Amino acid sequence: MTADLLPVRRALLSVSDKTGLVELATALAARGVELLSTGGTAKAIRDAGLAVKDVADVTGFPEMMDGRVKTLHPMVHGGLLGRSGLDDAVMAEHGIGAIDLLVLNLYPFESVTAKADCTLADAVENIDIGGPAMLRSAAKNFARVAVATDPSQYAELLASLDANDGQLSASTRFAFSVAAFNRVAQYDAAISNYLSAVTATDAAVPARAEYPAQMNSTFVKVMDLRYGENPHQSGAFYRDLYPVPGTLATFQQLQGKELSYNNLADADAAWECVRQFDAPACVIVKHANPCGVAVGAGNGDAYELAYATDPTSAFGGIIAFNKPLDAATAKVILDRQFVEVLIAPDYEPAALEYAQKKANVRVLRIPHGDGLNNFDSKRVGSGLLLQSSDNRGMTRDELKVVSKLAPTDKQFTDLLFAWKVAKFVKSNAIVYAKDNRTIGVGAGQMSRVYSARIAGIKAADANLVVEGSVMASDAFFPFRDGIDAAAAAGIKAVIQPGGSMRDAEVIAAADEHGLAMVFTGVRHFRH
């Protein structure tokens, strides 16, 4: 049986990250804890005027091989693995003293190998051997030993000691043990991923494959969800171990009901779409598709234009802004429509105060950040599809005019706006746009011409005038029928990737209808 409270009399400290080290060592010494340490950690403690015993004095064996061997010794691992009541005699026979607390973080393999100029030799030298071994020994023996692996745990460690008269509870020891095993798993995964990607070792900086032979991923649980995609499915949200700044995983929920699986999926689509724009923008998403997108003079203007695209679909949608949300716009939204989630990089205090009148509305803050996800993944039966993220932008200079008529300056602006939106619409995707706002969106149809027709129907239902608008298509037109449908609706310019066997027919259709057409040479399928 695990004793609930066990005293801490002897601690071994060995850290690469010296953050908070002196403060922790000082606090432990003040509580009468004997300190053992190694190398640079011992020096830092000693320089702070604290008494510390070198591990070499405990083992009777000096550090050797440039520090590669220093703690791989029975006097250390016996002190960590010894079981109270079972191993007391053998420990006494061999003079092994119990170690009650291990404070250790590992060589910085991840940060070293993240550098573009990291050599294979640098990577190898930052593979910790003794550290993970000690962590595993201490974590396995949580019945008697506590282990801390990160400076963020120090405050909790000291608070627990103070609350229990210099002792640590079984629940604290177990929680720290789990954290230690998780850290070792993360560390080993990073090493495996790095070395599995190395394809050539003849250069100082090794050649590495984009997709390693083995992929080990680590995710940290953020929360349980109300349910999965449907109420009969359970769900949870996990984030990357090191989330990219500015992405959904960095959100803070300020109010509202529990988030659902669909809430987060839609929130990600809305946020990734809106953060493309520099000017104030609003994106309204329903079932992972933008149903209204606009750039405006401010939040209120952008919202009104986005909402007008498809007021019916906006009901119960997710609304995202790329600028801090003001109180006036928040009031208009919450007074007008039912909204599942509001997203913005920040909020005026008055906006948050007003949102409290609708307590169920989920309000998310996602701090600004220019980071982009490098990879996208999708589970298939017993497998994982992994690809580089579709972060490809487009500028006017990259567009190729293929029609007899060239777009006007205003049409070029609208074409690039529509192209940005089309990237976030489920394929087959068609976007009608004018004046930096969507006029109609046709999403997820098996036939491209039907997406074009639906975009026109959406515009008509919203009493929006298509005449003079532009059209974006996420992929090439296999036939001219999509161009014919667009021209009949009043479209005057088209942006599409090109690349169809019938490009000549499609271009001829554009010329026949007096449409300007540009090719991007880039496809934006989204499934």
Curated annotation (Swiss-Prot):
Coiled-coil intervals: none
Involved pathway(s): Purine metabolism; IMP biosynthesis via de novo pathway; 5-formamido-1-(5-phospho-D-ribosyl)imidazole-4-carboxamide from 5-amino-1-(5-phospho-D-ribosyl)imidazole-4-carboxamide (10-formyl THF route): step 1/1; Purine metabolism; IMP biosynthesis via de novo pathway; IMP from 5-formamido-1-(5-phospho-D-ribosyl)imidazole-4-carboxamide: step 1/1
Keywords of the record: Hydrolase, Multifunctional enzyme, Purine biosynthesis, Transferase
Residue ranges of domain MGS-like in the record: 1-149
Any GO molecular function: phosphoribosylaminoimidazolecarboxamide formyltransferase activity
Any one biological process term the GO annotation gives: 'de novo' IMP biosynthetic process
Domain of life: Bacteria
EC number(s) on file: 2.1.2.3, 3.5.4.10
Signal sequence annotation: none
Name of this chain's protein: Bifunctional purine biosynthesis protein PurH
UniProt source species: Stenotrophomonas maltophilia (strain K279a)
Lineage of the organism: Bacteria, Pseudomonadati, Pseudomonadota, Gammaproteobacteria, Lysobacterales
Gene name per UniProt: purH
